[in-house]
Amino acid sequence: ASSLQNAIFNNAYGIPAGKLGSELLDESLEHLTNSYPHVQQIHGEKVVSISGEAGNFIVTTNKSSLQAKIVVIAIGSGNPFTIEGLESFVIPHQKAAPEKNRIQLKNTDHLVTEGIYAAGVLAGHRSQLSIAAGSGASVATDILTFWNNGNPVQVHDALGK
């Protein structure tokens, strides 16, 4: 499940105020289906292991195995990390509050190892809906953390808060 599931957006460019994260996720999947019908979406499966090498990975899920030339992992920073084959890359999250016990994959500019990339908070970034482009989003959360006296920030409102 995505962290967006519990979010509410009141000040995100192009998104109406009060939009729920759960609605945004559903609309995004519908948009992907309608705009890119040739892209296969895999629902209800969880990756349990990644093996092989760049250009010839085997991604094993709880239901099937898939072949991939490149793998992008963007599953959040929850602990424990349960994808076999990547355990040696797991480190404490460098930008999350230590008491949250979050993890990231060790990477250089998102590259974990040849052919495997981490994105979002799993790559060591802070969580933010895409309202700034490129590295500007990371810079924005760095500045917000500075303004917040060094306390890491999550940049979206949440229901019930």
Residue spans of the language-model regions?
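Helical element adjacent to the flavin cofactor pocket in flavoenzyme catalytic cores
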Residues: 22-41
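Short secondary-structure boundary/capping segments
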Residues: 1-4, 49, 63, 107-110
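Structured catalytic cores of enzymes that bind and process phosphorylated ligands/cofactors
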Residues: 58-62, 66-67, 71-73, 116-119, ...
